[in-house]
Design a protein with these regions (language model features):
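Extended ligand-binding clefts on enzyme/binding-domain cores
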Residues: 11-49, 53-56, 62, 80-84, ...
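Mature N-terminal, pre-catalytic/accessory segment of carbohydrate-active enzymes
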Residues: 1-7
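Internal amphipathic alpha-helical repeat/solenoid segments
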Residues: 47-89, 94-116, 121-137
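Short glycine/serine- and small hydrophobic-enriched flexible loop segments
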Residues: 91-98, 147-158, 217-224
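Aromatic-rich carbohydrate-recognition surfaces in CAZymes
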Residues: 80-87, 135-160
Length: 236
């Protein structure tokens, strides 16, 4: 890559690189590659190459696979299955790259095969499915749910809400509502966030957390976009 001078990076003159206001509030989105001295042309090319490899590269390199006419999944190549973390990360990549078709394909696959409508985990997504859609487990991993919700909110703001499962913001709010309120009635499962200490659980059935699941920058936006009754929870 060709490097450019620091003065050409586009970072606002005089602004501290450790400014704590945040990009959402400041409306200034830092380009860390540019700050390291790479040209925008090189950055755009590198990012697009990575996306094309993941989604449309050779079979021994890609891990996105179209399924039928309107669905697709991301494969965990080490286990040859589809997992909610990979599916939700894939949706986040697509909305960041303005790739609505791929986003909708992944989301439809997740809703069709991973979403659970019965049992104590109804309203959550099965964390692992075979690539034909058969569920490997009937449990959920909360990191997938929180990434699904944020990707859906971003999609709503970027493309607007559609109908059915493509009413992105409605789907996100419903998912977060279940994550917070499940278990309030006896025999209805457990919430993904502990109602007492507000910490995300490793799995709903256990009372310990996973540090890698904690995404406070997500929760700040959930406090703005989730159901109004749940916003104080996300602000806590």
């Amino acid at each position: 890559m060709h490097k450019v001078e620091a003065a050409e990076t586009g970072f606002p003159k005089g602004r501290s690189v450790d400014n704590m206001q945040g990009a959402f509030a400041a409306k200034e989105y830092r380009n860390l590659f540019a700050q390291c001295g790479y040209s925008q042309e090189d950055i755009d090319r590198k990012v697009e190459e990575a996306f094309q490899t993941i989604f449309y590269g050779p079979e021994d390199q890609r891990f996105y696979h179209p399924a039928g006419e309107d669905m697709g999944y991301l494969e965990d190549t080490g286990n040859h299955d589809a997992r909610t973390e990979g599916m939700s990360y894939g949706m986040m990549m697509c909305v960041q790259m303005d790739r609505k078709e791929e986003f909708d394909r992944i989301w439809k696959w997740a809703k069709t095969y991973m979403y659970m409508t019965e049992g104590e985990n109804a309203g959550y997504f099965a964390w692992s499915c075979q690539t034909d859609g058969t569920k490997n487990a009937w449990g959920a991993a909360p990191d997938g749910e929180e990434y699904f919700a944020m990707a859906l909110f971003f999609a709503s703001h970027r493309w607007g809400d559609g109908e059915g499962i493509f009413a992105y913001s409605q789907e996100a709010r419903k998912l977060l509502h279940d994550c917070v309120h499940k278990g309030e009635a006896p025999g209805t499962g457990r919430a993904m966030w502990d109602p007492a200490n507000k910490l995300i659980r490793f799995v709903a059935e256990q009372d310990f957390s996973d540090p890698s699941y904690h995404l406070p920058h997500f929760y700040q936006l959930f406090a703005l976009w989730a159901d109004e009754e749940d916003r104080p929870f996300w602000e806590a």
